[in-house]
Amino acid sequence: MRLYELSFDEVERFFYKLAELRDTVKDSGLMSYVPELVSLTGQVQGTTRVKHAFPIFQKGGVVMDVTSVEQAGIAEEAGAVSVMVLDKLPYDVRKAGGVARMADPKIIEEVMNSITIPVMAKVRIGHYYEAKVLEALGVDMIDESEVLTPADEEHHINKWEFKIPFVNGARNLGEGLRRISEGASMIRTKGEPGTGNVSEAVKHIKIVNQELRALLSMAEEDRVKKSRELQVPYELVELTVKYARLPVVNFAAGGIATPADAALMMWLGTDGIFVGSGIFKSEDPLERAKAIVLATAGWEDPEIVLEAQKMISEHKAMMGIDIKTLKPEELMQVRGA
């Protein structure tokens, strides 16, 4: 199987044409044509090109963790491109301890029925059947997430077997490429979830960028050796060199709590932002959500980020956690390397 059939631009053009066709049918009022459109999307659902096109539509946006219909409504009002449904926010997962599993399907379904933006949900690393349940439920994307307690300490889900796109976390180039080789359509550069501390996310995107620069400077024979070292197909390494970046959409996640945090991660080269506890563990969730969306979209202009930062109060931010105070066994980022 070829991992990739199209370039980013080609995938984007394909998906936009599909969206334009959908809008034309809707605007025409000729509802008899809608079944034909549904049939068309059904034929292409699950192909490599479509699974990689969905994350492209999220680029430049913010995905927000939610645990209820009310929070999902706030996220949509604030301008989130998608929501991620889970049972507890990462901060609460950390405090509660025990085993963290996927959210109640009834809650996920309620969220899906209450908003118009895409809905994602988390599964435990390696838990094939939690993923199958979410695929049957009809969510838009699955996050095989280190925030939940891993079901398999050694292996991730073989994502090629699913029609639905997956996102996975990574702390370095090797982890990212291994997840892509398993079928991930999107990568999250890992931070330390539930801390409100962006330092680990910063560290890991810098590692990815540094390792990418090293890969680009290698001779071909050295890249062959590197692919063996990273345990990924050589073709995937060559595709990474061709694009001079991870060959899928790469968002930042973990510890992002302010508009400036989001702008920093965009400046460092990510395509968008996941926000976990930073919004709904604050005392000003709607204002903070709007501010982070604004800063993510306008990160190239410091005046816009300043405007976003003025929309919130530091006194209302979530109480952060100094990562240096966490024990090694308390770190979530190390799960699923």
Curated annotation (Swiss-Prot):
Q: Which reaction does it catalyse?
A: aldehydo-D-ribose 5-phosphate + D-glyceraldehyde 3-phosphate + L-glutamine = pyridoxal 5'-phosphate + L-glutamate + phosphate + 3 H2O + H(+)
Q: What is this protein called?
A: Pyridoxal 5'-phosphate synthase subunit PdxS
CDD domains documented for this protein? pdxS
SUPFAM superfamilies on file: Ribulose-phoshate binding barrel (SSF51366)
Q: Name one GO molecular function term.
A: pyridoxal 5'-phosphate synthase (glutamine hydrolysing) activity
Residues the record marks as active site: 122
Q: What is any Pfam family matched here?
A: SOR_SNZ
PANTHER family, per this entry? PYRIDOXAL 5'-PHOSPHATE SYNTHASE SUBUNIT SNZ1-RELATED
Domain of life per record: Archaea
Entry similarity comment: Belongs to the PdxS/SNZ family.
- Subunit structure of this entry? In the presence of PdxT, forms a dodecamer of heterodimers.
Protein's pathway = Cofactor biosynthesis; pyridoxal 5'-phosphate biosynthesis
Q: What class of enzyme is it?
A: lyase
Could you say which residues bind D-ribose 5-phosphate here? Answer: 65, 194, 255, 276-277
Which EC number applies? 4.3.3.6
Keywords of the record: Lyase, Pyridoxal phosphate, Schiff base
Cited InterPro entries: Aldolase_TIM (IPR013785), PdxS/SNZ (IPR001852), PdxS/SNZ_N (IPR033755), RibuloseP-bd_barrel (IPR011060)
Which lineage is the organism of this entry classified under, starting from the top rank? Archaea, Thermoproteota, Thermoprotei, Sulfolobales, Sulfolobaceae
